[in-house]
């Protein structure tokens, strides 16, 4: 693809004059850039190769950087001299032509002024070979070890973009230039002066394609070509420039084609808008294989995401869940289906919101089972934590409803069961699949630690899988929000995943216990077994040095080293204790793009290709096995009618017996009591199930919604 770039966006227009450009002094050329960041960006665009090897030490990096900058300065100096010579020649020719054209002096002066303004380093034609788009990472820490510190966020990396459906090429760009020239000629009373046309063509060729647009980053709706994707390797072609200039001169002689040119110009503007929209929302279908691959770049850890915005889709629409008014929502607004699971305090059921038709998970806790003060504290902590966190890899809690007998959590529904189910179905995962799963877990734990929350219950049973194959952490009953990063001393969690410092509660424990549990999970995912058995020997091994045995010989040394560093008995030596960036920077994650992984809504998850995931029809089974709350209400309304019909039948039967004059013997008092007892049981059997299922809907309840809520249930 070929395109015309407006100018170097990173070089100020007033920083170069003809005198400085002809001297070729390195210090003068260096002053073109506002800072070292802009110069580094130009280097990245000029050379299609890494600037230096990030594994080298600082001295070698400085030498390589200086050498690269010198070569760039020489290239820029030559290009600037050629450009200024061509522009000065054009200016002199235009001045001579102006003396012979008295009727168009004003137009020629304007054109000369525009060309004089173009002495400020505007690029001529740039030949593009491939289709690429720019990807700018979000803010990140500075690169250390260089002679000048360069912000990492300014380094732009190229991602392939499929623009096969967009008919944007150099010919269209030239057509737009021709149309602008013809429009200018018509505005000047259709004066077909070739010299004036040359001036207009030169001015418009060096400036932006649209005469009214400025050489800056345009919005998606502006009709410029500044946002057309380009490849960092570009070449300056003076021959192509002269050829296009001659073609423009010939096309300007056709002054009668103004209407046709306007139509072509409008079509080009529409295509340009479509191109800008395609850059804002990628036209390529995301693929799991190439999504996690990135160009060679330094592995630099960005700060953890603290505030996650509502999920947006590719078309710009918001998640439908955000349209629900949770403050006015009641528990009776949901239809309840089958059970998703049960625990010591309650059960989880599938439910559906009537207004939106969206599925949710309702976690119901029975107050009668929560008697101990420690249990009450865990429930209060869970509610306060779940209502105040929001992350793509954590189950979202939207609202809670409190009744005199029950507590209801309305949470995000992950319809592909949990990680333990898929691990049992596949026995173990491949190393690549495990890497993608663990990377998502790392982001979730990193977010919790940034909020001063210790998870303390990481295990495959608490890692749910959503419809796209991504992980979702759930069950924050054992989580603890600390103040100022202080340690906690309570002993809780699942024994197989407990860190040694939890068992030795004298000094307390902190956030590193989650990284220990992660090491156990990684070992379990790739081997299908736990590293420690549930025995006294296992307890002793956690307190002393141990040696893990990997029976699978195909595992790489990187994953073994990753597990060993996570399962360090000393928390101060454990990977991720002082900074989660040490986990991201581990060599096992060298091919993971963390920036892309943090925005996961447009791609399929790591489990989406497994047979256990594809064949998991949890929603359909639950809907087939259970009845909705609406159907239960209809049955409850129909019961009085059935009773009335039964009473009518009894009356008819009694009337028939009276007509036949049967003689009945009176029953004994004992038989009468038995008959009443049987009738009582019969009536209870008809209504018992409905009364039990709908008891919570008839009770007065209060609700708490997400968004900075602090609630105390007990």
From Swiss-Prot:
Residues 88-122, 174-266 are annotated as: Disordered. Its EC number is 2.7.11.1. The modification Phosphothreonine is found at residue 488. It catalyses: L-seryl-[protein] + ATP = O-phospho-L-seryl-[protein] + ADP + H(+); L-threonyl-[protein] + ATP = O-phospho-L-threonyl-[protein] + ADP + H(+). Residues 334-589 form the Protein kinase domain. GO terms for cellular component: cAMP-dependent protein kinase complex; cytosol. It comes from the Eukaryota. InterPro entries: Kinase-like_dom_sf, Prot_kinase_dom, Ser/Thr_kinase_AS, STKc_AGC. ATP binds at residues 340-348, 363. Keywords: ATP-binding, Kinase, Nucleotide-binding, Phosphoprotein, Serine/threonine-protein kinase, Transferase. GO terms for biological process: signal transduction. This is Developmentally-regulated protein kinase 1. The lineage of its organism: Eukaryota, Amoebozoa, Evosea, Eumycetozoa, Dictyostelia.
């Amino acid at each position: 693809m070929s395109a015309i770039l407006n100018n170097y966006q990173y070089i100020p227009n007033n920083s170069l004059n003809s005198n400085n450009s002809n001297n070729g002094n390195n210090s003068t050329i260096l002053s073109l850039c506002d800072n070292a960041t802009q110069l580094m960006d130009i280097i990245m665009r000029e050379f299609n190769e890494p600037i230096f090897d990030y594994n080298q030490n600082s001295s070698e990096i400085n030498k390589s950087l200086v050498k690269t900058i010198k070569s760039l300065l020489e290239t820029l100096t030559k290009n600037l001299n050629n450009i200024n010579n061509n522009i000065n020649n054009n200016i002199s020719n235009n001045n001579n032509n102006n003396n012979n054209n008295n009727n168009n002096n004003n137009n020629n002066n304007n054109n000369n002024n525009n060309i004089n303004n173009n002495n400020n380093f505007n690029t001529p034609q740039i030949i593009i070979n491939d289709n690429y788009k720019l990807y700018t990472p979000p803010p990140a820490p500075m690169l250390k070890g260089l002679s000048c510190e360069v912000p990492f966020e300014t380094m732009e990396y190229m991602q392939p973009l499929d623009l096969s459906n967009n008919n944007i090429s150099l010919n269209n760009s030239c057509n737009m230039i021709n149309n602008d020239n013809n429009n200018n000629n018509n505005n000047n009373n259709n004066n077909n002066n070739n010299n004036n046309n040359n001036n207009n063509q030169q001015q418009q060729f060096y400036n932006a394609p649209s005469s009214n647009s400025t050489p800056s980053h345009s919005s998606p709706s502006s009709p410029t070509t500044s946002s057309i994707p380009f490849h960092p390797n570009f070449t300056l072609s003076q021959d192509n420039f002269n050829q296009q200039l001659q073609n423009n001169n010939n096309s300007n002689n056709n002054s009668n084609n103004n209407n046709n040119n306007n139509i072509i110009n409008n079509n080009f503007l529409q295509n340009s808008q479509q191109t800008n929209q395609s850059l804002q929302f990628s036209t390529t279908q995301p693929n799991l294989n190439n999504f996690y691959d990135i160009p060679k770049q330094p592995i630099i850890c960005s700060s953890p995401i603290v505030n996650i915005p509502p999920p947006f889709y590719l078309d710009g629409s918001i998640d439908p869940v955000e349209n629900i008014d949770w403050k006015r929502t009641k528990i009776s607004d949901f239809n309840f289906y089958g059970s998703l699971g049960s625990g010591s305090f309650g059960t989880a059921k599938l439910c559906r919101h009537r207004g939106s038709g969206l599925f949710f998970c309702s976690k119901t806790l029975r107050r009668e089972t929560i008697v101990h003060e420690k249990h009450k504290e865990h429930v209060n902590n869970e509610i306060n934590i779940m209502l105040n966190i929001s992350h793509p890899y954590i189950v979202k809690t939207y609202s809670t409803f409190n009744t005199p007998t029950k507590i209801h959590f309305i949470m995000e529904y992950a319809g592909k069961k949990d990680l333990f189910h898929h691990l049992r179905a596949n026995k173990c995962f491949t190393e690549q699949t495990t890497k993608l799963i663990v990377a998502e877990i790392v982001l979730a734990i990193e977010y919790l630690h940034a909020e001063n929350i210790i998870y303390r219950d990481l295990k495959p049973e608490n890692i749910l899988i959503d419809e796209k194959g991504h992980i979702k952490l759930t069950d924050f009953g054992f989580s603890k929000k600390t103040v100022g990063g202080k340690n906690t001393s309570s002993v809780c969690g699942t024994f197989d995943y407990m860190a040694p410092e939890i068992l030795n509660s004298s000094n307390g424990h902190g956030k590193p216990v989650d990284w220990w549990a992660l090491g156990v999970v990684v070992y379990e995912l790739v081997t299908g077994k736990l590293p420690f058995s549930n025995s006294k020997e296992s307890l002793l091994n956690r307190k002393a040095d141990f040696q893990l045995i990997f029976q699978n010989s195909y595992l790489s040394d990187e994953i073994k080293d990753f597990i060993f560093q996570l399962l360090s008995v000393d928390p101060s030596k454990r990977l991720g204790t002082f900074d989660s960036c040490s986990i991201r920077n581990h060599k096992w994650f060298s091919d993971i793009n963390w920036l892309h992984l943090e925005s996961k809504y447009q791609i399929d998850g790591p489990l989406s290709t497994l047979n256990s995931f594809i064949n998991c029809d949890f929603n359909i089974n639950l809907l087939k096995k259970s009845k909705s709350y609406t159907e239960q209400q209809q049955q409850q309304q129909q019961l009085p009618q059935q009773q009335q019909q039964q009473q009518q039948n009894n009356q008819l039967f009694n009337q028939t017996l009276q007509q036949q004059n049967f003689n009945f013997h009176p029953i004994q008092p004992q038989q009468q009591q038995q008959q009443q007892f049987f009738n009582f049981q019969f009536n209870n059997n008809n209504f018992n199930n409905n009364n039990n299922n709908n008891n919570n809907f008839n009770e007065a309840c209060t609700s708490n919604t997400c968004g900075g809520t602090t609630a105390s249930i007990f």
